[in-house]
Regions:
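Mobile, glycine-rich extracellular loop/lid and propeptide segments
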Residues: 213, 218-230, 234, 253-254
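Inter-helical turn/loop segments and adjacent helix faces that build the functional surface
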Residues: 230-247
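Second-shell loop/turn segments in exported
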Residues: 111-112, 209-217, 238-241
């Protein structure tokens, strides 16, 4: 880990200052996978009240009236029209060419071109971030559920609970000890490191979705490796610290670097550097809930 200052292309922030400023948001990273669950009341447009909780999904603007008061024929027809072949959501690709050719040959996707500023890895980093803040285990297809009643088994913060689980005590299957050093388990012996696996080759993970494909599994493995290197780094600098303190500091460093990647690499690709700089300098002005939670509008629509 380099200690020299690194200036970002935003021109106003250096790496050291950013990592130091993140400390207040990462004080509780060494223990439980859930933050202390906070609650607040919300109110709908019709005057109904409900709980907002960190471990539940919610609505971004609960006071707004419904777009459509009830599901009827007109609404159904409108939705079918939007999604029909040739409709406004149809990219009009030549589906007969097959999925591989449509991905590999840009000439076949003139109506749906690749993003010139995104690498292929951007997609999978986005998937990794999503798995760190949302995991709905209870909802079922075609079974309407109020978002306030839907359990989110991930914390509504970028704290890498999808990597660390509940920590060494609550998720011991993820960890191994090297003397006083608590490290995440990795399998070695092949061409590259791999996630730890059971005899049936299923991965031992805090979030099973992070073995859905080789790219997301590679990202998970990279964070395991980074944490383990951070453990060695902290142990060398603080030889008198016990295993818990070394682990907590290594997790803090890993999480701070993760935050740096989100702010300075990922977000500018999607919302532009100017908006990132505006938020960093002027703060949030519109969405400032008293209790942190993931809005269902973000989880199910905007982030997609």
């Amino acid at each position: 880990m380099k200690t020299n200052q690194h200036r970002s292309h935003s021109g106003g922030f250096d790496r050291r200052r950013f990592l130091g400023a993140c400390g207040a948001g990462a004080l509780a990273l060494g223990g439980s996978s859930f933050l202390g669950v906070s609650e607040a009341f919300g109110q709908t447009a019709s005057g109904g009240r409900f709980f907002l909780r960190e471990d539940r999904f919610g609505r971004m603007f609960p006071g707004l009236p419904a777009f459509f008061s009830r599901t009827g024929r007109r609404l159904t027809e409108a939705l079918v029209d939007i999604g029909k072949p040739g409709g406004i959501l149809d990219a009009k690709d030549n589906l007969a060419a097959g999925p591989v050719a449509l991905v590999a040959d840009p000439a076949l996707s003139l109506n749906n071109p690749n993003n010139a500023t995104h690498t292929a890895g951007t997609t999978f980093m986005g998937q990794f971030l999503d798995h760190d803040v949302t995991f709905d285990l209870g909802s079922r297809l075609n079974v309407p559920v109020d978002p306030e009643d839907s359990l989110n088994t991930r914390t509504p913060a970028f704290d890498l609970d999808s990597v660390y689980g509940g920590g060494p005590r609550r998720s011991p299957e993820l960890y191994g000890y090297q003397g006083s050093r608590i490290k995440l388990k990795l399998e070695n012996g092949g061409l590259f490191e791999d996630l730890p696996r059971r005899s049936n080759r299923s991965a031992i993970l805090a979030d099973p979705r992070n073995d859905e494909n080789i790219m997301i599994a590679g990202l998970q493995t990279a964070f395991y490796s980074f944490h383990n290197k951070a453990v060695d780094y902290v142990a060398r600098r603080h030889s008198r610290w016990d295993s818990d303190d070394i682990f907590k500091e290594a997790r803090r460093l890993t999480t701070w670097h993760y935050h740096w990647m989100i702010i300075h690499e990922f977000l500018p690709l999607f919302i532009g550097q100017n908006l990132v700089d505006d938020i960093l300098h002027r703060g949030r002005r519109f969405y400032r809930p008293r209790v942190g939670f993931i809005p269902v509008e973000f989880q199910g629509a905007a982030y997609r």
